[in-house]
């Protein structure tokens, strides 16, 4: 990456936001492959499984714009930290799912706390990378998806 002209600090920031968004992205997509097992274990119908998956995206869609505003108001570092810690807690709580409603609420909340992540990561890139570096930095950042 030194050929691109990134400093060590910039590389550290880029790796950090890349890993942060990767975690958020995996949270978003991993459940689709788990749904056959979840449906069977929790006696979900196919329709319940579909709406269960959709709960994340409903929460995410609600929080993307306010999450970006929140990152601007309180800072992207704090927003990323709170989002990651909240994702960890909610993911741990998912191991206690015993019914559809509880699982749906947790998926929805996971979407809510994941919403600010992308905007916060892009704010960090905006702060640490100059105008001639941002395109490459954003391209590398988005490669985790």
For each predicted feature, which ranges?
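Transmembrane alpha-helical cores of Major Facilitator Superfamily
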Residues: 22, 54-58, 85, 108, ...
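Conserved MFS/SLC helix-loop-helix module at the cytosolic interface between two early adjacent transmembrane helices
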Residues: 62-101
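Juxtamembrane helix-start elements in MFS-like secondary transporters
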Residues: 45-53
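Small-residue-rich segments within alpha-helical transmembrane domains of MFS-like 12-TM solute carriers
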Residues: 25, 29, 95, 111-119
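Residue-level signature of mid-helix packing/kink "hotspots" within the transmembrane helices
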Residues: 29, 57-65
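Extracytoplasmic
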Residues: 12-46
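Cytoplasmic helix-loop-helix junction between adjacent transmembrane helices
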Residues: 106-144
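Helical-face signature of the major facilitator-like transporter fold
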Residues: 20-25, 57, 91, 99-111
């Amino acid at each position: 990456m030194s050929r691109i002209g990134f400093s060590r600090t910039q590389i550290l920031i880029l790796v950090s936001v890349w890993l942060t968004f990767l975690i958020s992205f995996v949270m978003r997509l991993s459940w689709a492959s788990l749904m056959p097992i979840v449906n069977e274990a929790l006696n979900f119908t196919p329709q319940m499984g579909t709406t269960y998956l959709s709960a994340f995206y409903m929460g995410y869609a609600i929080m993307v714009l306010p999450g970006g505003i929140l990152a601007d108001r309180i800072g992207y570092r704090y927003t990323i930290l709170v989002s990651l810690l909240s994702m960890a807690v909610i993911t741990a709580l998912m191991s206690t799912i015993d019914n559809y409603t509880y699982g749906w609420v947790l998926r929805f909340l996971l979407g809510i706390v994941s919403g600010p992540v992308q905007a916060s990561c892009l704010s960090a890139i905006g702060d640490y990378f100059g105008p001639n570096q941002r395109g490459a930095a954003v391209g590398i950042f988005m490669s985790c998806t």
